[in-house]
């Protein structure tokens, strides 16, 4: 026994010594999460790993082993997840789950007791207002109550849905939607009520209009009549009544007053017993006026006006301008009175006529979409009904037309102010001439007062007296002036068609209208004649320029005859040129007068040279019988320049000094025909071409005798025949064809106008043809000039070629120093 104890004690001491030796030999460099095996080796702790189980390298480290990923075979079970820890791992329940025991972790699937957590029960306020919490496996959701939706910025906050604006309501069209918090209602609109058996509010509500007028629910004033409308009502003035000042008609608060007779009194400053009696009768009608008797009052006023204009009495003794003022006052007042008294819808359609010719047509209708035509014996008016409707006034529309032929007595000699395209009368142009009134004076009015710029034109068809041929017809209206009087005007009115006894007018405003006739013949321009004039004069200018150059440069033909030709050509050249470029420059009166006087002088000078040409031709023919050239030459040279340029200058000076304002017309820079002023040109012209024609006839008679006395020598015969041909051509050159201008009357006027324009616009062509192209001496000179020109051109070309050849020829080389040495 004792030996065994001793043996055990010895073994224990041996082991204790070995352990002490090992402890002293443990390696001190082992890394974190490891332990030493001996003095030279280490081993990683459980849950960590290195490159080998036991390692001896001091640089080795121990890494944590992730037991939650392969190849580890850790399984935590359903609704849980493995969570790695330092050197170990845990199993935890998924969010929204918890262990039955309440513990937070477990180690393996056998310990898994994870179950769903009901968040809605744990926190009833988890979802905000108007939201409901719904538990789900491992989580929860918030759902909005009906009529609400989530706000985009906060998925837990619900906000109201406006079913009325979003269109998410089935309300009937007879209701209107009212949004509530989380809901809506379908309520009847104001002025509507639920149909029998229908609720008022739910989405199946159906409503019908309430007739406030028949049910007595309206609040219309006693001066108005209730008119039911869909969902409401309006209050309109009673027939013959009108809204009080500042209060619109057809409103719920409309208040009306009985219709007043429009104010119509004697115009100030006019002293006439006849007119005073008329307005006394008008005042009597005003005093006894009742709305119900509006039709009778209209008839009475028109009857009194008809009698006044049939026998104006002392009105005709008033000065013309006062008569025009009275007419303006009568037309204005008549229009206002008739418009005011015609608003009674019970009137309907009226047509009155009176002994002196006054006619009245009226139509009163509710709003219609059609044209209306009012016909009278002497006038017809056509327009669309929408022109008569006053903006914002649902009442009846009025269209009226009154024809007052007697008004023409007061409007006699009234002035006309027309637009430029219709300008036929100008005080400075046609003094004392006034347009003639052809038709009756008519006045048109509508219930709409704004008739100065109508949306569509009104058409008037006038019957009138026969129009004098070639007189212009104008559609005019009476325009009121600032002084209380007025004048005829054409602005806004156009003449669409005119015949002998009828005219169609179209106007964009309403007033008093009539048809006027110009007091003198108005000639319309023929575009064909204009083209012929400008083409003929342009060709004549070219020929006159060539002829003048020929007479100046051709020395062989220069004599008294060519001097006459040259002066005639220059005068016509300047006159035609001024005519082409300045005849229409009427915008400046002074400039136009200067142009007209210059044309007057140049054409008179040209005709004077034509007279001298005819005289010289006559003397030449006479001297074929008796030779006396020297005396002729001295006589011609001494007189021709003073006569040709002096006489026209005196004539123009006298005309300009006596009536300078008659130079220039509204359309042309020429002499005006008034007071015989145009005869300052026509008189000398007629005298000259008459003398020229007589001289030419005598010349031809002399030549005929000369031809009969000649022998048959060919050269003499040919020269004399050429002289005869030239003498005949002088009919065109010497202005004898200007008589065609005087013959422009009657049926042949158009033919004469064309002949006059063609022949006289080509006068320069005849001069160049007869005096240049048919002259043998001139033709010979043309040939010489042509040969000289060709020779000059050839020499120029040869000189050019010679200069070019010299430049192209190589120059001989000059020997240098090396050449000299050799």
Swiss-Prot record:
Its main location: membrane. Residues 797-822 are annotated as: Disordered. Residues 19-530, 584-589, 659-676, 750-753 are extracellular. It comes from the Eukaryota. The record marks 510-511 as: Cleavage. It is found in: Cell membrane; Cell projection, Ruffle membrane. One of its GO terms (biological process) is adenylate cyclase-activating G protein-coupled receptor signaling pathway. Residues 475-523 are annotated as: GPS. GO terms for cellular component: leading edge membrane; plasma membrane; ruffle membrane. The GPS region of the GAIN-B domain is necessary, but not sufficient for receptor cleavage, which require the entire extracellular stalk. Cell surface receptor that binds to the chondroitin sulfate moiety of glycosaminoglycan chains and promotes cell attachment. Promotes granulocyte chemotaxis, degranulation and adhesion. In macrophages, promotes the release of inflammatory cytokines, including IL8 and TNF. Signals probably through G-proteins. Belongs to the G-protein coupled receptor 2 family. Adhesion G-protein coupled receptor (ADGR) subfamily. This is Adhesion G protein-coupled receptor E2. The gene is ADGRE2.
């Amino acid at each position: 026994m004792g030996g065994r104890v001793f043996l055990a004690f010895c073994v224990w001491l041996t082991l204790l010594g070995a352990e002490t030796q090992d402890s002293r030999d443990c390696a001190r460099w082992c890394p974190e999460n490891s332990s030493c095996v001996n003095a030279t080796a280490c081993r990683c702790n459980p849950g960590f790993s290195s490159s080998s189980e036991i390692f001896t390298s001091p640089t080795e480290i121990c890494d944590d082993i992730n037991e939650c990923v392969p190849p580890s075979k850790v399984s935590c079970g359903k609704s849980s997840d493995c969570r790695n820890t330092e050197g170990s791992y845990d199993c935890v329940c998924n969010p929204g789950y918890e262990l039955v025991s309440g513990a937070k972790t477990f180690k393996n699937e056998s310990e898994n007791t994870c179950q769903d957590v009901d968040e809605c029960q744990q926190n009833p306020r988890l979802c905000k207002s108007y939201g409901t919490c719904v538990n789900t496996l491992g989580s929860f959701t918030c759902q909005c109550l009906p009529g609400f939706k989530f706000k985009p910025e906060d998925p837990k906050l619900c906000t109201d849905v406006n079913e009325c604006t979003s269109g998410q309501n089935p309300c009937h069209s007879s209701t209107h939607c009212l949004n509530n918090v989380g809901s809506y209602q379908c309520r009847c609109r104001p002025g509507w009520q639920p149909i029998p058996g229908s609720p008022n509010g739910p989405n199946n509500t159906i409503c019908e209009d309430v007739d406030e007028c028949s049910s007595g629910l309206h609040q219309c004033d006693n001066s108005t009549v209730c008119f039911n409308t869909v969902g409401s009502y309006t209050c309109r003035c009673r027939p013959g009544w009108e809204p009080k000042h500042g209060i619109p008609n057809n409103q719920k608060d409309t208040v009306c007053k009985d219709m007043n007779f429009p104010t119509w009194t004697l115009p100030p400053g006019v002293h006439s017993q006849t007119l005073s009696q008329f307005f006394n009768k008008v005042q009597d009608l005003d005093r006894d006026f009742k709305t119900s008797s509006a039709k009778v009052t209209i008839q009475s006023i028109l009857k009194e006006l008809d009698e006044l204009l049939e026998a104006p009495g002392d009105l005709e003794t008033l000065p013309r301008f006062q008569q025009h003022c009275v007419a303006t006052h009568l037309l204005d007042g008549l229009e206002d009175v008739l418009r005011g008294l015609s608003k009674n819808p019970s009137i309907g359609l009226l047509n009155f006529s009176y002994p002196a010719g006054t006619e009245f047509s009226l139509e009163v209708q509710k709003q219609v979409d059609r044209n209306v035509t009012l016909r009278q014996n002497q006038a017809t008016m056509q327009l669309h009904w929408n022109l008569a409707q006053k903006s914002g006034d649902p009442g009846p529309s009025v269209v009226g037309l009154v024809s007052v032929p007697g008004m023409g007595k007061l409007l006699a000699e009234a002035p006309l102010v027309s637009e430029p395209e219709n300008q036929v009368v100008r005080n400075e142009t046609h003094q004392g001439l006034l347009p003639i009134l052809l038709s009756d004076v008519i006045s048109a009015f509508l219930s709409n007062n704004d008739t100065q710029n109508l949306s569509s034109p009104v058409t008037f068809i006038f019957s009138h007296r026969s129009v004098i041929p070639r007189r212009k017809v104008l559609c005019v209206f009476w325009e009121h002036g600032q002084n209380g009087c007025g004048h005829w005007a054409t602005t806004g009115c156009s003449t669409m068609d005119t015949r002998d006894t009828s005219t169609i007018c179209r106007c964009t405003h309403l007033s008093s209208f009539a048809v006027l006739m110009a007091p003198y013949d108005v000639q319309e321009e023929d575009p064909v004649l204009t083209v012929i004039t400008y083409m003929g004069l342009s060709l004549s200018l070219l020929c006159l320029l060539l002829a003048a150059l020929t007479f100046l440069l051709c020395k062989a033909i220069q004599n008294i005859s060519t001097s006459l030709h040259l002066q005639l050509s220059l005068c016509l050249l300047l006159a035609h040129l001024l005519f082409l470029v300045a005849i229409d420059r009427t915008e400046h009166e002074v400039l136009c007068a200067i142009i007209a006087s210059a044309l007057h002088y140049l054409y008179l000078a040209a005709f004077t040279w034509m007279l001298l040409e005819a005289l010289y031709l006559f003397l030449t023919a006479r001297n074929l019988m008796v030779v006396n050239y020297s005396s002729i030459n001295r006589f011609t040279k001494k007189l021709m320049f003073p006569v040709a340029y002096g006489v026209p200058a005196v004539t123009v000076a006298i005309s300009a000094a006596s009536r300078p304002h008659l130079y220039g017309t509204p359309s042309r820079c020429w002499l005006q025909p008034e007071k015989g002023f145009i005869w300052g040109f026509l008189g000398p012209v007629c005298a000259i071409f008459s003398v020229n024609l007589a001289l030419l006839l005598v010349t031809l008679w002399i030549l005929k005798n000369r031809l009969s006395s000649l022998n048959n020598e060919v050269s003499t015969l040919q020269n004399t025949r050429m002289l005869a041909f030239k003498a005949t051509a002088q009919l065109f050159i010497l202005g004898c064809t200007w008589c065609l201008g005087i013959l422009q009357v009657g049926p042949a006027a158009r033919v004469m106008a064309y002949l006059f324009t063609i022949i006289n616009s080509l006068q320069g062509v005849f001069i160049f043809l007869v005096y240049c192209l048919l002259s043998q001496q001139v033709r010979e000179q043309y040939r010489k000039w042509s040969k000289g020109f060709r020779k000059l051109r050839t020499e120029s070309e040869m000189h050019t070629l010679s200069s070019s050849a010299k430049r192209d020829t190589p120059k001989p080389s000059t020997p240098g120093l090396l050449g000299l040495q050799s």
